[in-house]
């Protein structure tokens, strides 16, 4: 696609192409490395500076800690039990399990990415960082600028823009966002839970774009103070809501978990109701 669009020249040596598509650090779980970023590095003399070596070791150790210590431990000892049988646990326990999964999946994906980036540095190659504190995002649009950055930028450049992006009016832009995230859900797996996950994110992105348009806020404009705090809380909990469907292949399990969690909020509302004097 990049060659067709004229962004890179066709490769003259087949060995460069084979090396690019088979470069092992990023094959398992990313980051997605583009040819125009990687191929020029092949042609440079191999050089690993002391800074690159130190940073590479740090990222590998940090990634292994995230994956093997945090993610795997939380998954085996906490998250799996609750997600597999949500009705056996209280609403609070289900909510804690959901928070645990949010941490687990972040440490899992970002851990793999850190390891890949670290190994690449030891071999003399630079990959872009793939996660940028995504749970600090104050909007769903900001979340997708921080979460799995190589995937979100790939979806933007090769699906969203190819569908027309924002070039054909507001309605078409919102529809393109929903279609892009729908296909992004299918990219994770051809099952209904991933489709729902992608659709939820697509609709949320479209609604946020519409809200930005209505309120006159500019692209990339950051909120501050208490407004940002509320934005972070709302965005995080929306993302967690979507994780329920991402994690559960069984829709019934997802609905059971939502019911259990919903009882927590119902009980809080009941407690907060003022008592009537008799």
Where are these regions (language model features)?
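Membrane-embedded transmembrane alpha-helical bundles that form the catalytic cores
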Residues: 1-269, 276
């Amino acid at each position: 696609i990049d060659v067709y669009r004229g962004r890179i020249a066709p490769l003259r040596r087949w060995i460069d192409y084979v090396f690019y598509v088979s470069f092992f650090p990023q094959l398992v779980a990313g980051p997605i490395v583009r040819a125009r970023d990687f191929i020029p590095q092949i042609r440079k003399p191999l050089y690993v500076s002391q800074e690159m070596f130190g940073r590479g070791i740090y990222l590998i150790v940090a990634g292994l800690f995230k994956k093997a210590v945090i993610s795997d431990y939380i998954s085996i000892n906490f998250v799996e039990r609750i997600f597999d049988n949500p009705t056996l646990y209280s609403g609070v326990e289900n909510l804690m399990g959901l928070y645990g999964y949010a941490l687990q999946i972040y440490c899992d994906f970002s851990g793999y990415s850190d390891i890949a980036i670290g190994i690449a540095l030891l071999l003399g190659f630079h990959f872009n960082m793939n996660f940028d504190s995504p749970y600090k995002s104050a909007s769903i649009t900001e979340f997708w600028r921080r979460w799995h950055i190589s995937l979100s930028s790939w979806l933007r450049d090769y699906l969203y823009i190819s569908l027309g992006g924002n070039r054909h009016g507001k309605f078409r832009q919102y529809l393109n966002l929903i279609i892009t995230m729908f296909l992004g859900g299918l990219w994770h797996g051809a099952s209904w839970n991933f489709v729902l996950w992608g659709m939820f994110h697509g609709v949320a992105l479209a609604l946020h774009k519409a809200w930005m348009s209505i309120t006159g806020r500019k692209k990339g404009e950051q909120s501050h103070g208490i407004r940002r705090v509320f934005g972070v809380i709302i965005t995080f909990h929306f993302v967690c809501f979507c994780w329920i469907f991402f994690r559960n292949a069984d829709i019934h399990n997802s609905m059971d978990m939502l019911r259990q969690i919903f009882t927590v909020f119902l009980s809080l509302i009941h407690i907060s109701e003022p008592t009537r004097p008799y």
